[in-house]
UniProtKB/Swiss-Prot annotation:
One of its GO terms (cellular component) is cytosol. Catalyzes the ATP-dependent transfer of a sulfur to tRNA to produce 4-thiouridine in position 8 of tRNAs, which functions as a near-UV photosensor. Also catalyzes the transfer of sulfur to the sulfur carrier protein ThiS, forming ThiS-thiocarboxylate. This is a step in the synthesis of thiazole, in the thiamine biosynthesis pathway. The sulfur is donated as persulfide by IscS. The lineage of its organism: Bacteria, Bacillati, Bacillota, Bacilli, Lactobacillales. The gene is thiI. Keywords: ATP-binding, Cytoplasm, Nucleotide-binding, RNA-binding, Thiamine biosynthesis, Transferase, tRNA-binding. GO terms for biological process: thiamine biosynthetic process; thiamine diphosphate biosynthetic process; thiazole biosynthetic process; tRNA 4-thiouridine biosynthesis. Its EC number is 2.8.1.4. The keyword ATP-binding applies. Belongs to the ThiI family. It catalyses: [ThiI sulfur-carrier protein]-S-sulfanyl-L-cysteine + a uridine in tRNA + 2 reduced [2Fe-2S]-[ferredoxin] + ATP + H(+) = [ThiI sulfur-carrier protein]-L-cysteine + a 4-thiouridine in tRNA + 2 oxidized [2Fe-2S]-[ferredoxin] + AMP + diphosphate; [ThiS sulfur-carrier protein]-C-terminal Gly-Gly-AMP + S-sulfanyl-L-cysteinyl-[cysteine desulfurase] + AH2 = [ThiS sulfur-carrier protein]-C-terminal-Gly-aminoethanethioate + L-cysteinyl-[cysteine desulfurase] + A + AMP + 2 H(+). It comes from the Bacteria. Residues 60-165 form the THUMP domain. ATP binds at M183, L184, H208, F209, R265, G287, Q296. It is an enzyme of class 2 (transferase). This is Probable tRNA sulfurtransferase.
Amino acid sequence: MQYSEIMVRYGELSTKGKNRMRFINKLKRNIQAVLSVYPKVHVKADRDRTHVYLHGTDYQPVAESLKQIFGIQNFSPSYKIEKSVPALIEAVQSIMKEVYQEGMTFKITSKRSDHSFELDSRELNQTLGDAVFEAIPNVQVKMKAPDIELRVEIREEAAYISYETIRGAGGLPVGTSGKGMLMLSGGIDSPVAGYLALKRGVDIEAVHFASPPYTSPGALKKAQDLTRKLTKFGGNIQFIEVPFTEIQEEIKAKAPEAYLMTLTRRFMMRITDRIREERSAQVIINGESLGQVASQTIESMQAINAVTNTPVIRPVVTMDKLEIIDIAEKIDTFQISIQPFEDCCTIFAPDRPKTNPKIKNAEKYETYLDVEGLVERAVAGIMITEITPQAETDEVDELIEGLL
């Protein structure tokens, strides 16, 4: 038998009261976006669960995609069966013979939305249980935590049987907790920060600073590929490329070396905040981890944050590097992050950056620069690309080969 649909059950949505259907409809749209690569798949949502109809599509890749989508507690692949007692008996016996192993226990759980069906739920449980005993005489019933639970659902159009329950990603549907701008460098930390923000329902747009010719096309493609990895958790993501060459050259030429990193990050924060305002987002998200590098001390964060009143979320701020790497490997961004392309944070990095920069000193050195003009030109020059789960081309391997 071939699976006909996947029944999706909700996670934290059960606590959302009057907003429940808003959350469910957003989850439905996210599932549709992620599964858009499967044209035959159809998604239908109701208050208790979402149904993913396969229409002949291979179950396995669809299930792998569903495992990544936030807002799903668990899901079960189901067989569509003719709505008759003989057909249900035959299907139950066939499934049990396939999955049963010596010593396993079982349970039948029936549910009817079609109350005109010839048997009620109790009678159906008894009839199908007897059919299992007929097929496997030595099998034992266990009402709590059986090894195999056959779930039978009688609907208007057909009957459905499932026995597997696969854990989902949990969390909240992406887009139900507002919108944030993710400062995406190309390193290990910022994609993990983006993933954790997505898990709590924040819709993200990725802001990447590029400084050609100092940064290569490979660095840009790397950031786009990292963004693409994040799309599997909630659908398409807008990728915003910011031209940053002029700003970095100006800082390098006119500011003390010890403050290069502080001033660079203050400009990044200003520009991201300006883009956030124009694109109606509420927060900024970055991958700063306390004490990991010189620019990520509390004093540095304070000096950089001083240019904005917008909340800055730092999901990995208390994690050590190994914890962050564990998540990066889990979400399949680690191998991309370690590709040998420098980003704009490393090309002009001073040998001895200031670890306790003073806000008044940063403000003083910025008087040497046309801060407003530089920010305005950078924002005016942004390029926006919609990143989808499917890459149009994959040039990274070629770019790496060119470096070797």
